Amino acid sequence: MASYTIVYFPVQGRCEAMRMLLADQDQSWKEEVVAMQSWLQGPLKASCLYGQLPKFQDGDLTLYQSNAILRHLGRTLGLYGKDQREAALVDMVNDGVEDLRCKYVSLIYTNYQAGKEDYVKALPQHLKPFETLLSQNKGGQAFIVGDQISFADYNLLDLLRIHQVLAPSCLDSFPLLSAYVARLNSRPKLKAFLASPEHVNRPINGNGKQ
């Protein structure tokens, strides 16, 4: 029986990184899908700590905030670096992912038509730090930190994949990031999840953009 439950809208959004993590780590979970009409009625929203989703259940532990959920899974499943130094770097990477994700969400939900061209033009400067980090770790042939996968890898992979949908050539000038995405995409359990109807048929965002 699954001990994890994801309560979220019928989109990838802020939950796909945790789904990728759980699938790749051979963990089972349940989905409680919240229709927007139901959400707008109010009671569920009022019951959520910050008035927002996702909500995550791990047994009797209830968590909100997607990055807190990822960090919890990182600690629980041994995906937080091998020592405190690596854990600090994993946190740094994840904060960098969050910075770019917030820019992406703002574009998608508030300024897509008018802002997409400028966003894509500025994208290389936001991707470059991740290419640099890869180059500093085993020549870019491993993970974003150390020699074992971390929760930040799943979050970064999700971020890069959705940007490849937004701008298909965005990684062309970043050979290490391109190889990194291909390498993680090919992990057997993750590859199976990414090919599954659950992933393929779930839109990235909730407003029809991607």
Swiss-Prot record:
EC number(s) reported in the record: 2.5.1.18
UniProt enzyme class: transferase
Known catalytic reactions: RX + glutathione = an S-substituted glutathione + a halide anion + H(+); prostaglandin J2 + glutathione = prostaglandin J2-S-(R)-glutathione; prostaglandin J2 + glutathione = prostaglandin J2-S-(S)-glutathione; prostaglandin A2 + glutathione = prostaglandin A2-S-(S)-glutathione
Residues bearing PTM N6-succinyllysine: 103, 116
Record-annotated GST N-terminal domain positions: 2-81
GO cellular component, one term: mitochondrion
UniProt keyword annotations, A-Z: Acetylation, Cytoplasm, Lipid metabolism, Mitochondrion, Nucleus, Phosphoprotein, Transferase
Domain called GST C-terminal: residue spans: 83-204
Protein location: Cytoplasm; Mitochondrion; Nucleus
Record keyword Cell inner membrane present: no
Positions carrying Phosphothreonine: 62
Modified residues (N6-acetyllysine): 128
Modified residues (Phosphotyrosine): 4
GO process terms (BP): glutathione derivative biosynthetic process; glutathione metabolic process; hepoxilin biosynthetic process; prostaglandin metabolic process
A Pfam family it matches: GST_N
Domain of life: Eukaryota
Binding site for glutathione: 8, 14, 39, 45, 52-53, 65-66
Record note on quaternary structure: Homodimer. Interacts with CDK5.
Family statement: Belongs to the GST superfamily. Pi family.
Biological role stated in the UniProt entry: Conjugation of reduced glutathione to a wide number of exogenous and endogenous hydrophobic electrophiles. Involved in the formation of glutathione conjugates of both prostaglandin A2 (PGA2) and prostaglandin J2 (PGJ2). Participates in the formation of novel hepoxilin regioisomers. Negatively regulates CDK5 activity via p25/p35 translocation to prevent neurodegeneration.
The name this protein goes by in its record: Glutathione S-transferase P
Lineage, broadest ranks: Eukaryota, Metazoa, Chordata, Craniata, Vertebrata
Protein encoded by which gene: GSTP1
